[in-house]
Design a protein with these regions (language model features):
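Membrane-interface loop-to-helix entry segments
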Residues: 69-85, 130-138
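Membrane-interfacial alpha-helical segments at the cytosolic side of multi-pass membrane proteins
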Residues: 80-93, 138-154
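Small-polar-interrupted transmembrane alpha-helices in polytopic inner-membrane proteins
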Residues: 16-21, 102-121
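"…centered on the first transmembrane helix and the immediately adjacent amphipathic helix/loop
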Residues: 2-79
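Interfacial helix-loop-helix junctions of multi-pass membrane proteins
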Residues: 113-137
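Membrane-interfacial, low-structure loops and terminal tails that flank and connect transmembrane helices
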Residues: 158-166
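Post-HEXXH active-site segment of zinc metalloproteases
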Residues: 87-109
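Membrane-helix interface segments
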Residues: 4-8, 96-104, 126-130
Length: 166
């Protein structure tokens, strides 16, 4: 019963995260740009105030524009890192071998990234880019790699302490 509840909860979390990604992708380009542009401008404003950079409003806008692309891509990578982790949690309750859990999670994120890009093709002002699928999949890979090495370190520590972690 516990395993079944775990599968249901982790499955719901992964699907809910996919829905969130879908909702972001469903925004027309103008709306999406307005959101990310506003965020970048607030980040630059905050940095200017905190670090006492004395940038003019024009310089702040130019800097916000300059960082918008990397900020957007970092956000995509983060979205897909989280999707990779949630998918791993789901497959953890479904598959026995850990290697298969990692591979299934990565494959799920990669396939979802591809379908998400296909979906964006039909949104006004948006396009489908193979490079974005690669960036999203890289995000999932990084999230899963961090998890893999964290588990490795924790297990090593637990062995030294004679604890078990499964």
């Amino acid at each position: 019963m516990k395993k079944q509840l775990y599968r249901i909860v982790t499955g719901i979390l992964a699907v809910a995260w996919m829905c969130l990604i879908f909702s972001f992708s469903n925004q027309p380009a103008t709306e999406s740009s307005k959101v990310s542009g506003g965020l970048c401008h607030r980040l630059v404003e905050r940095a200017n105030d905190t670090l006492h950079l004395d940038m003019t409003e024009k310089q702040q806008l130019a800097m916000a524009e300059k960082i918008e692309y990397p900020v957007r891509k970092a956000a995509h990578m983060t979205e897909y890192a989280i999707l990779g982790l949630l998918s791993f949690a789901f497959y953890r309750g479904l598959l026995k071998k850990e290697k298969r859990q990692f591979l299934a999670a990565l494959l799920t994120a990669a396939v979802y990234a591809a379908t998400d890009e296909f979906h964006q093709y039909f949104i006004p002002g948006r396009s489908a880019e193979v490079m974005d699928v690669c960036i999203d999949t890289l995000g999932a890979s990084i999230g899963l790699a961090i998890l893999f090495f964290t588990l490795k370190v924790v297990r090593k520590h637990c062995q030294k302490s004679k604890l078990t972690l499964q």
